[in-house]
């Protein structure tokens, strides 16, 4: 089984970002470079939803950012989304960020995530399992009151084909 998340080839990331800048005139560096999900298959599935325009939001445990040494996204941030193999595939821009308890995530936000049947019920089941997979190795149990970083984004640029 391949390690996840994959370590991206920095030359590919740099070339991808340069192509994005040349195509869009954007100045500056990406705020983050990452795949979605916690497995190759999930990364590919979620990337496909982004590229299809169906997935326009994502949600992570707030504690993830602290534990992993990551910065909470903010409106205007640009991120490079990787595929399951660690290749850069698209650029998204954060449009809105709210931090709410897990139990307060709305049906409207769940639908914007673009996953499953778009229902809040599906979102809660899938994300409870996803968060549990991250928490359990750290000796923690998922709770309804854990803060969730609810990020909305737009797809602003995609590569015609994966690099390399």
Predicted feature descriptions by range:
Residues 1-91, 97-164:
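Mixed-charge, low-complexity intrinsically disordered regions
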